[in-house]
Amino acid sequence: MTQLAIGKPAPLGAHYDGQGVNFTLFSAHAERVELCVFDANGQEHRYDLPGHSGDIWHGYLPDARPGLRYGYRVHGPWQPAEGHRFNPAKLLIDPCARQIDGEFKDNPLLHAGHNEPDYRDNAAIAPKCVVVVDHYDWEDDAPPRTPWGSTIIYEAHVKGLTYLHPEIPVEIRGTYKALGHPVMINYLKQLGITALELLPVAQFASEPRLQRMGLSNYWGYNPVAMFALHPAYACSPETALHEFRDAIKALHKAGIEVILDIVLNHSAELDLDGPLFSLRGIDNRSYYWIREDGDYHNWTGCGNTLNLSHPAVVDYASACLRYWVETCHVDGFRFDLAAVMGRTPEFRQDAPLFTAIQNCPVLSQVKLIAEPWDIAPGGYQVGNFPPLFAEWNDHFRDAARRFWLHYDLPLGAFAGRFAASSDVFKRNGRLPSAAINLVTAHDGFTLRDCVCFNHKHNEANGEENRDGTNNNYSNNHGKEGLGGSLDLVERRRDSIHALLTTLLLSQGTPMLLAGDEHGHSQHGNNNAYCQDNQLTWLDWSQASSGLTAFTAALIHLRKRIPALVENRWWEEGDGNVRWLNRYAQPLSTDEWQNGPKQLQILLSDRFLIAINATLEVTEIVLPAGEWHAIPPFAGEDNPVITAVWQGPAHGLCVFQR
């Protein structure tokens, strides 16, 4: 029987060198680690890892080849009160595995036990890691490196974006390949998108609770193997990595960046009643934040929280991020529940992972976007991330909806959000692009649902409509649900136009939710994380071409306005912005706080956004000059308007002089 050589303690994971495979695994509290390899017949062969350098266990298996399936059994104490839950009866996934064979099914054998260990062996049904070799021809691929000031983000789901697209070949719809298909790339280019932000593509599992209800985790925020691509999005699991990189290469050639939504805050092992896949059995005490009673700190709402202040976990997270940049050429990351990244346990800008990213010559050069909160006390950290990070700006989302749909926001508050929320982000040398402005995202109502539903309708999620937020700031315009009279449809359309214009012509970095540009609805479901069906898949056959053209025209207009693309804070008198009332005069203090919802925003001294957010048609006196309405608010041939615009109720228009 082949014996393991000691091998090397780095890098982490399984690496083929042409002669064999080096295996390394971190565990600070293990007493023994067994490498378990499986032959073509499924027969298991076990080897003790002979090397033990600090907290790294390692060994080298001569003659091992790519395609070898493996896992680990880790021996150590079962002391739940101390945070130790070692159970060598359970086969464990390598945290750095780059491919997984098998499915993460709801099975009692995939649990380690709660108070007492479950010593039933699970190797027969446990997913296995696969050794991969990395050979790929990137040709002349180069990152687009779009300046932040010119960035337009499009948030999309790999499957949902393309699964129903009639012009993409059936056999590749819903896959990585479809992202790189010319039809999709041409669409993104025509729309004006510069960055495609993908919901999680690292391998994830569906929670046992969902599986028992016949549902699945659709969004992907339940990670199980952070270095492995989710195989369900590949035409073939064995070629997933090549398919993904082919798509990135094609997108790069078109000048489109790729940003990955990544989940470093928790794992699919959930709470103590959750499954055992990997980290809990390898070194529970090190990988997770553990309470004094041995249970998890649940700062994520998902049952556990990764301890990103632990040096080994920081190394793991950093290696994961570098892998996606160096191996897959991704251009940035959006970090889910990113306040966890800064917990020590208190949130700190100089937390270990932030410092590691700042000091990394690879990671410090890509786009970094934080979802700047978690659910723990002190978890709301909007505006408090280190300067390298941009942040989701929920202030903007709520203000835009309140202004146009609830009519309860003063002009001053609206203008502050329009100006990149400088009261929040203008600090520590940060630029306006640090504010990722959004009106909608995957989490919440779609844009169409914002104007069609007053209340969430999440019954299909199986929680009796308890899940999902109740704070939607939506307005159904008098009738709950889709459809209605022509007048109702037109009023809803006008509100959509107003919200899109506010999003795409405000200072900061705009993020558009895929499907909003053609009227996609989730029928009032504002938490569709478990709906892998036509509720979430974009129906291109029903797409509103008029709304798509309107959105594209706004994006292309944005790119013409220096005040929006130069990425400099607006200062009084610098020519970037003037705030005027309905009479083209500067607003008084009282008008900012108590005046009617009528406003003119003059950008770069040439572009004028005239707003009438009142219930009545109102005359808006334009500033001096010869003005004409510009697309998408008018055709190419427009009469000159010298004095007054008849502003419709809840309307706006953009002019140029």
Curated annotation (Swiss-Prot):
Positions of the UniProt region annotated as Disordered: 458-479
Biological process according to GO: glycogen catabolic process
Record's keyword terms, sorted: Carbohydrate metabolism, Glycogen metabolism, Glycosidase, Hydrolase
Annotated positions for site Transition state stabilizer: D443
Residue positions of the active site: D336, E371
E.C. no: 3.2.1.196
Positions with biased composition (Basic and acidic residues): 458-467
Catalytic activity reported: Hydrolysis of (1->6)-alpha-D-glucosidic linkages to branches with degrees of polymerization of three or four glucose residues in limit dextrin
GO molecular function, one term: glycogen debranching enzyme activity
Pathway as given in its UniProt record: Glycan degradation; glycogen degradation
InterPro entries for the chain: GlgX_C (IPR040784), GlgX_Isoamylase_N_E_set (IPR044505), Glyco_hydro_13_cat_dom (IPR006047), Glyco_hydro_13_N (IPR004193), Glyco_hydro_b (IPR013780), Glycogen_debranch_bac (IPR022844), Glycogen_debranch_GlgX (IPR011837), Glycoside_hydrolase_SF (IPR017853)
Described function: Removes maltotriose and maltotetraose chains that are attached by 1,6-alpha-linkage to the limit dextrin main chain, generating a debranched limit dextrin.
Family note: Belongs to the glycosyl hydrolase 13 family.
Protein name: Glycogen debranching enzyme
The organism of origin for this protein: Escherichia coli O8 (strain IAI1)
